[in-house]
């Protein structure tokens, strides 16, 4: 009980320090995460070792870059939770077979099945929330990432592909240079406006 209270205090402190607004995180989702953390316990020293799974500085940049990165984060969470679900036992053992396996300390095999089912349902709930957010708020990023992944599928050994790619290069090189130049100009104008505001 004391450990649960301590975990809640630490989570609140972490949300405050990192500047995360919990207004988008439904209360039920927050509660579900807290319950899952009881199942996936690690020492506090490991949780706060200074090496987050998703480094904070990766979220720097303009809005478009942040959106693309956050799409990748949501996709990674989808994969991670899918992996966590696969690690859970799929079905309880047939009757009579629990005599063969020793119960874990403090629980019987009969007690473990509902706990695993509860963990599974909670993980499924979190997965659905992530998938909903990704599907409804990150569609453009999804399309862009699929287009980027398709670039990796280009047949490098194909002579036709090589020739066509060379033919298309001047036009694409022009677009890439112009895009980078326009972005740099916009950044300089923004910096100049900010300097003017500071002087005023």
UniProtKB/Swiss-Prot annotation:
Residues 91-114 are annotated as: Disordered. GO terms for biological process: immune response. It comes from Oryzias latipes (Japanese rice fish). Probable cytokine. Residues 1-22 form the signal peptide. Residues 95-110 have a biased composition (Polar residues). GO terms for cellular component: extracellular space. It is found in: Secreted. Isoform A: Widely expressed. Isoform B: Specifically expressed in ovary and testis, with strongest expression in ovary. This is Interferon gamma 1. Keywords: Cytokine, Glycoprotein, Secreted, Signal. Induction: Isoform B is up-regulated in response to 17-beta-estradiol (E2). Glycans are attached at residues 30, 158. GO terms for molecular function: cytokine activity; type II interferon receptor binding. SUPFAM superfamilies: 4-helical cytokines (SSF47266). Belongs to the type II (or gamma) interferon family.
């Amino acid at each position: 009980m004391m450990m649960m209270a301590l975990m809640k205090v630490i989570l609140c402190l972490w949300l405050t320090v990192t500047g995360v607004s919990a207004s988008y995180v439904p209360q039920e989702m927050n509660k579900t995460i807290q319950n899952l953390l009881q199942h996936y316990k690690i020492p506090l020293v490991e949780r706060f070792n200074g090496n987050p799974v998703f480094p904070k500085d990766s979220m720097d940049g303009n809005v478009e870059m942040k959106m693309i990165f956050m799409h990748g984060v949501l996709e990674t969470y989808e994969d991670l939770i899918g992996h966590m679900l696969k690690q859970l036992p799929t079905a309880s053992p047939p009757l009579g077979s629990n005599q063969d396996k020793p119960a874990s300390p403090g629980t019987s095999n009969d007690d473990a099945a509902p706990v695993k089912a509860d963990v599974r349902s909670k993980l499924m709930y979190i997965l659905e929330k992530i998938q909903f957010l990704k599907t409804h708020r990150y569609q453009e990023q999804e399309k862009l990432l699929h287009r980027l992944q398709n670039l990796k599928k280009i047949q490098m050994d194909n002579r036709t592909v090589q020739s066509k790619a060379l033919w298309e290069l001047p036009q694409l090189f022009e677009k890439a240079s112009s895009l980078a130049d326009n972005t740099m100009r916009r950044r300089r104008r923004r910096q100049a406006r900010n300097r003017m505001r500071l002087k005023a």
